[in-house]
Amino acid sequence: MLVAPEALRIAYLQTVLTVDGRPASDVADEMGSFWVVTAHNPLSEQLAAAKNTELHQELCGRLDEMGYQSLPALGSSPDGTWVEESIAVFGAGKRPIRALGREFNQHGVFEVTKRTLRVHGCFSRWTVQR
C-alpha cells in the first residue's frame, strides 16, 4: 500500500486552489461542494511540461467519459513556486474520485466545501483537513 509521507500531507493542506481564476471557497459558496484532481507530476515526481500537458488531456478525456461537470482549476504552493493544472469536478462521490486519482498515480485528491478543505489519500485511507 502506497502512503503519502506526513510532510507531503501537510504540504497538501497549504495548497492554494483556484477554479476558473476564482478562490475555491468562493466557488463552493456559489456552486456547492466539489473535488479538485490533477494528473500532473504523478507520485510527486516532477515531469516535463509536455508530459504533464499530455496527462492533463487524458484526465480531461476520462472526466468527459464519466459525465461529470468540470471547470479548469489550479493548485499551487502558497509562494507560487509549484503550480499544477487541475480540474474541479462537480457531482462526484469520494469513491470514483479516489479511483481516478489512483488511475493517474496521485497521492491525494482535494474535497472543497463551503467551510473545509480536505485532502483524501488515493492509495490508502487517510484524510487531512483545514
Which residues does each predicted region cover?
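N-terminal, charge-rich interaction modules
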Residues: 1-62
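Short, flexible segments with low predicted structural confidence
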Residues: 35, 68-73
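A short secondary-structure junction signal
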Residues: 48-49, 99, 121-122
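Structural alpha-beta junctions
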Residues: 57-70, 105-107
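Short, flexible, solvent-exposed loop/turn segments with mixed acidic/basic and small polar residues
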Residues: 71-81
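Short, compact, well-ordered microdomains
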Residues: 82-86, 90-119
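Short, low-order "capping/linker" segments at domain edges
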Residues: 86, 121-130
